[in-house]
């Protein structure tokens, strides 16, 4: 029997068993002292026991704490579907996606990148179009590109403009404003021969100096203008109303006035000068010449119906032939129906073409005479206030419009023998609140002047109207109504910059006396919002335009008061820097704000008519809201009469 263990040979079998102990995850751990707790854990000492627990937003046993990624754990965060969860150390945040901004009231609200400069990356010439969470850029007509980069293409620009390179981009420009200068004495046709070659020219140029300011229009002898084959304009120069025209420049050599030619463009500019889009000549030595008889023009800037002409070396603006008329019926009339004035203008050039060297013009009241205006053209104008009476103006009115009529008398001498020319003209205005007050004899109205620093003085008016059309104000200093009637109150703003300011009714209330500070007040509008408890109150317009409107059913104060006075505190709201349109919740609480009596309009008295039903609340008029000061009818007629 063999021995299992031998001193010479021995097998050893060893069995090793490994144990891995994984501690169970717990929220707390016992510790000897608080110093053993993790920096993101909380230490609790209860008698002899000390425990460590991870703070909210962390996970672990208190001795070791790691950040909990709430965004990765379902239900660990409360971000809505429209927001993105972003994990932070010990917490998380809900952020809006790109193109949205977090609002405490509306959640993720779209950012209008087009509203403010710098928010979009659109090209300066492009139009920015806002979308939900994004925006797009569109190049203007005639331009190519993705909107972030826009370039014109040859022939794509409007009349009188050309596509030229400025820096790294192609843009549409007026060559009268953007060009280079050529001031070289040797370009004169009177200068002798030379070896200049305009091979480097290209683009828009203007000739200046004593050598002449424009290309000659006739063939130039060879060996002039400091070159061998002088170049001249084969054609005539355009007038300023033709814009950019195509022409050919010819080079004279070997007995041929147009042996070589080059395409060019020409434009006549206001002020009596020309600009040329020159191209390099096809050969050398060729150079562009100038006409020395065309000295530098000294016209003041001519109008669109004038050309700068030289007469015996003197430059002045002359009427263009294109604007001449031969018949009085073709005389152009410009009628402007303004807010406060009516102006009729006649073209001075056309009057001159009809033989009016001197113009005498006046209205029904001859004290209202004509005067000269220099704008885009020279005009002879007369002005009358848009009121009944001044300058002989007559006002007529129907249910929808107020019309102001007058007659212009025209003569070319102080005395009239042969012909008396009359031009009848009229402006019609839709009846809105302002026009209605202006055309009423004694409207029930209150007025207040408000001065805004740097922007002028404004006048605010408040009036009482008979219907929801707000076109028939009550007449006189008082009115009597039953409690079944409705009060239609309109406020309106005049003067100053109406494009910037709107009228805001902050507090409107009634009192039984004319005292606006009477402690007995019934608020119709308070803190910009209508009284919610009174269902008869309707605010049609407030903080949206230069006018405000509201209505309320007539009432009387308890205590046998028969008089009602209306008071409105108004505020001029700057739409550039303020939010003007009120936002009114369904439930409102009285704020007790102090009323500024310097901004209060007062109206009344309105007397209660006992027992008798006055007008009930009318249905909305078919007129709707008429836009302020929009002239719907502009008319002018021409009548020739013998004396």
Curated annotation (Swiss-Prot):
Keyword terms: Cell membrane, Cell projection, Disulfide bond, EGF-like domain, Glycoprotein, GPI-anchor, Immunity, Innate immunity, Lipoprotein, Membrane, Repeat, Secreted, Signal
Domain ZP: 336-587
Cell compartment(s), UniProt: Apical cell membrane; Basolateral cell membrane; Cell projection, Cilium membrane
PROSITE patterns: ASX_HYDROXYL, EGF_2, EGF_3, EGF_CA, ZP_1, ZP_2
Glycosylation sites: 40, 78, 134, 234, 277, 324, 398, 449, 515
GPI-anchor amidated serine lipid attachment residues: 621
GO cellular component: apical plasma membrane; basolateral plasma membrane; cell surface; ciliary membrane; cilium; extracellular space; membrane; side of membrane
Region named Beta hairpin: 152-173
Spans annotated as ZP-N: 336-431
Chain positions covered by the region annotation Essential for cleavage by HPN: 588-591
Gene3D superfamilies reported for this sequence: Laminin, Zona pellucida, ZP-C domain, Zona pellucida, ZP-N domain
SUPFAM superfamilies found in the cross-reference section: Growth factor receptor domain
Endpoints of the signal sequence: 1-26
Site (Cleavage) location in chain: 589-590
Region of interest (Internal hydrophobic patch (IHP)), ranges: 456-466
Protein name stated in the entry: Uromodulin
Gene behind this protein: UMOD
